[in-house]
Amino acid sequence: FRAAQCGFGYRRSVFRENPGRYLVVSVTYRLAAGVRGTVAYAELRKALGKSAAAAPLTDVYSTVLDHRRAKSMVIEADNPNRRSVGYFFVNPVLEARELADLSNRARSAGFEDLPFHPVGENHFKVPAAWLIERAGFAKGSRHKSVGISDAHALALIHHGGGTSAELVEFARQIRREVLVRFGIELQPEPVFVGFPTANPLSAGQSTE
């Protein structure tokens, strides 16, 4: 595949749109010296300040690395949160009616600060981490040999000596509590390999 054939976009690619068809075993990058990247991510633009549009790639690289390190998304031997696949659940995108229902549920539970931002016409993205923490799963929570990262509630981590069944069991607990409290069914972001179904978090599915 050449780059154009991969269909890369924000959280999308030809590989993601054809689950089970492809297995990526190697990647080759062609880099160019002296170019400037497009800085579109809001937190990154804020960190770079007024110079974001003209920032050298070295500055962008350092800022991205600092940003990811703060969320324990950099593999470092001395970081206990390093064993993860990144963010485990997808941030739900809701229609206006669904957002209103979620806001009402949140207020009824005593939460007035439901965060969201628009993503296209009549659709809004809600942080899954916010839902997870307010469903009773704080950062640093633990279940057997797995748990939630101390740095970000969306990252499920492995403390060592555990099994994939323990991880799926814990993810199911989180998913169930968010659904009961907020009426939102979180969807997993990673691809599951070696399970009977594509989504072992669904009720009634085996964890083996």
Feature map (PLM): residue ranges:
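Phosphate/pyrophosphate- and phosphate-bearing ligand-binding catalytic cores of soluble enzymes
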Residues: R2-A165, R181-E208
